[in-house]
Swiss-Prot record:
Function, as annotated: Component of the Mediator complex, a coactivator involved in the regulated transcription of nearly all RNA polymerase II-dependent genes. Mediator functions as a bridge to convey information from gene-specific regulatory proteins to the basal RNA polymerase II transcription machinery. Mediator is recruited to promoters by direct interactions with regulatory proteins and serves as a scaffold for the assembly of a functional preinitiation complex with RNA polymerase II and the general transcription factors.
Protein name: Mediator of RNA polymerase II transcription subunit 22
Family indicated by similarity: Belongs to the Mediator complex subunit 22 family.
One GO location term (cellular component): mediator complex
Coiled-coil ranges per UniProt: 93-123
UniProt biased composition (Polar residues): 164-188
UniProtKB keywords: Activator, Coiled coil, Nucleus, Transcription, Transcription regulation
Classification via PANTHER family: MEDIATOR OF RNA POLYMERASE II TRANSCRIPTION SUBUNIT 22 (PTHR12434:SF6)
Presence of the UniProt keyword Coiled coil in the record: yes
Chain intervals for the UniProt region annotation (Disordered): 164-203
Keyword Transcription: yes
Domain of life: Eukaryota
Subcellular location: Nucleus
Amino acid sequence: MAQQRVLPQSKETLLQSYNKRLKDDVKSIMDNFTEIIKTAKIEDETQVSRATQSEQDNYEMHVRAANIVRAGESLMKLVSDLKQFLILNDFPSVNEAINQRNQQLRSLQEECDKKLIALRDEISIDLYELEEEYYSSSYSLCDSNDLPLCEAYWREDFDMPSPESLSMPLTTATAEQSIATSQSSTPSHPHVNGHGAGPTDHS
């Protein structure tokens, strides 16, 4: 069996005051209502005139009705105070509500994560198929000089000058360039009878 929680002295006193207010208000309603019923009873004639007695009874009924209304308002205020007391001091219920809400949010988070993972897998598959389609169609439908992205990337790496060529002296590079230019500009003469044509003599 769960042990009964021991309330602090202030809370215990507060609950006792709530209990006393409840009993007093209910007793006030019952007493005033009973007196109103008694006042409605027609009594025998007394020394007081009937008109005076009617005014007195009318005033008494108004007062007791006001007391009933006041007691009812006090009970409504007591209900509000009890709700506030339970909300502020019922920590086990508050913790249980918080735990339930946390579990709901965790389950919702797990569901969202599963949906996101499934969506990621579908996108990956579609992306792979699109890449396969793109690379397979680039050879047959495009120009022969067009390369896939990966081959174009590596081709750029091969076409780039090496660090050694960048560090070569300017004179050496110029000399090599001039030799290549002279070789390309010298006309080649066909061999006649197995001998190459020599340079023409000028007189």
